[in-house]
């Protein structure tokens, strides 16, 4: 049985934490930023923990 390949696009966008959760980054922070408040843009810079239902699908793309 061949080894499962890692989805390279997902590997660049998501990381696994030490506890096994999936860490990602917020959307809506690349353009059209003039109408967004400074507080909102500041919070979008931070990473976030992906929701469990999405993390299940992402973890299939990142087997190793």
From Swiss-Prot:
GO BP annotations listed: translation
Pfam families reported in the protein's UniProt record: Ribosomal_L35p
Keywords: Ribonucleoprotein, Ribosomal protein
InterPro entries: Ribosomal_bL35, Ribosomal_bL35-like, Ribosomal_bL35_CS, Ribosomal_bL35_sf
Gene3D superfamilies recorded: 4.10.410.60
PROSITE patterns: RIBOSOMAL_L35
GO molecular function: structural constituent of ribosome
GO CC, alphabetical: cytosolic large ribosomal subunit
Signal sequence region: none
Family the entry assigns: Belongs to the bacterial ribosomal protein bL35 family.
HAMAP family on file: Ribosomal_bL35
PANTHER family: 54S RIBOSOMAL PROTEIN BL35M, LARGE RIBOSOMAL SUBUNIT PROTEIN BL35M
Name of this protein: Large ribosomal subunit protein bL35
Organism whose genome encodes this protein: Desulforamulus reducens (strain ATCC BAA-1160 / DSM 100696 / MI-1) (Desulfotomaculum reducens)
């Amino acid at each position: 049985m061949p080894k499962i390949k890692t989805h390279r696009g997902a590997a660049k966008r998501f990381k696994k934490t030490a506890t096994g959760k999936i860490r990602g980054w917020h959307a809506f922070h690349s353009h059209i930023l003039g109408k967004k408040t400074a507080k909102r843009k500041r919070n979008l810079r931070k990473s976030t923990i992906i929701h469990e239902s999405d993390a299940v699908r992402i973890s299939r793309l990142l087997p190793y």
